[in-house]
UniProtKB/Swiss-Prot annotation:
Function: Plays an important role in stimulating the translation of viral mRNAs. These mRNAs are capped but not polyadenylated, instead terminating in a conserved sequence 'GACC' at the 3' that is recognized by NSP3, which competes with host PABPC1 for EIF4G1 binding. The interaction between NSP3 and host EIF4G1 stabilizes the EIF4E-EIF4G1 interaction, thereby facilitating the initiation of capped mRNA translation.
GO BP field: regulation of translation
CDD domains, per the entry: NSP3_rotavirus (cd20714)
Keyword Cytoplasm: no
Ranges where the record places region RNA-binding: 1-149
Subcellular locations according to the entry: Host cytoplasm
Protein name in the entry: Non-structural protein 3
Short name of any one Pfam family annotated for the protein: Rota_NSP3
Family statement drawn from the similarity comment of this UniProt entry: Belongs to the rotavirus NSP3 family.
Origin species: Rotavirus A (strain RVA/Pig/United States/OSU/1977/G5P9[7])
GO MF, any single term: RNA binding
Keyword terms: Coiled coil, Host cytoplasm, Host-virus interaction, RNA-binding, Translation regulation
Any single Gene Ontology cellular-component annotation: host cell cytoplasm
Length: 313
């Protein structure tokens, strides 16, 4: 007879599919939040946590055990099914279930889910109506049993009491956001005003520097104009000096060779560049002094040859 394990295979497939769904949900959430992630790292972390929860809670073994029992019943082995039925009705099993329920109650209490909330959740359920904002409140079998046992009372003072629920003070939140916006606006304005003030100071410094540069340029232009005037005056004086010396030279009783030599030196004077002209005049004066010195020495020698003595008074 062929052994059937289709139920166990289906349960294993559902568990594996649940794990894949958990990985897809985790990666999709990270993508929507704009968080970069490593797929292999997410896969490893989710698998480790998923395997731990499924094994530690006993859910995986419970599902596989029940699937194995169903497969055994399908294969004609009812012994395990009978044992499971007896186990479910055993007093120890009931005590264990009570213990688990009490443990779950304490866990819920530690999480902030008090007795009132647990009882209300057990007695009522809410059914949403598609296309409408209203809902239908349904009573559970526990609520029906409590009504039959007379455990439901009507509290008239409840109408005047305010339900203790968590509400959002939108006005306070709006005021808080408005304060934050005003603070941010003030900081932006301060930064903008500071930037404008610095820009004004830079512009003022630039304009002041431009004025100083303009004044200096005007002064330089004035000095250049004055220097040009001085240079023109010097050129005029030098030309006048050369002309005067030439005229004076022609009126003197000197030999033509001497006059020609002096005129050549006068014509060689640079009348355009005053600095060169001064150097030329210096050279001319030195030559004249040197010629005078030679002439005096010649005269002194001639006097001595005539048996005369030269004296200076």
């Amino acid at each position: 007879m062929l052994k059937m394990e289709s139920t166990q295979q289906m349960v294993s497939s559902i568990i594996n599919t649940s794990f894949e769904a958990a990985v897809v949900a985790a990666t999709s959430t990270l993508e929507l939040m704009g968080i970069q992630y490593d797929y292999n790292e997410i896969f490893t972390r989710v698998k480790s946590k998923f395997d731990y929860v499924m094994d530690d809670s006993g859910v995986k073994n419970n599902l596989l055990g029940k699937a194995a029992t169903i497969d055994q019943a399908l294969n004609g082995k009812f012994g395990s099914t009978i044992r499971n039925r007896n186990w479910m009705t055993d007093s120890k099993t009931v005590a264990k279930l009570d213990e688990d329920v009490n443990k779950l109650r304490m866990i819920l209490s530690s999480k902030g889910i008090d007795q009132k909330m647990r009882v209300l959740n057990a007695c009522f359920s809410v059914k949403r109506i598609p296309g409408k904002s209203s809902s239908v409140i349904k009573c559970t079998r526990l609520m029906k049993d409590k009504i039959e046992r007379g455990e439901v009372e009507v509290d008239d003072s409840f109408v005047d009491e305010k339900m203790e629920i968590d509400t959002i003070d939108w006005k306070a939140r709006y005021d808080q956001l408005e304060k934050r916006f005003e603070s941010l606006k003030q900081r932006v304005n301060e930064k903008y005003n500071s930037w404008v003030q610095k820009s004004k100071e830079r512009n003022e410094n630039m304009y002041s520097l431009q004025n100083v540069i303009s004044q200096q340029q005007n002064q330089i232009a004035d000095l250049q104009q004055y220097c040009n005037k001085l240079e023109a005056d010097l050129q005029s004086k030098i030309s006048s000096l050369v002309s005067s010396v030439e005229w004076y030279l022609r009126s003197m009783e000197l030999s033509d060779d001497v006059k020609t030599d002096i005129e050549q030196q006068l014509n060689s004077i640079d009348a355009i560049n005053p600095i060169n002209a001064i150097d030329d005049l210096e050279s001319l004066i030195r030559n004249l002094i040197q010629d005078y010195d030679r002439t005096f020495l010649m005269l002194k020698g001639l006097v001595r040859q005539c048996n005369y003595e030269c004296t200076y008074e």
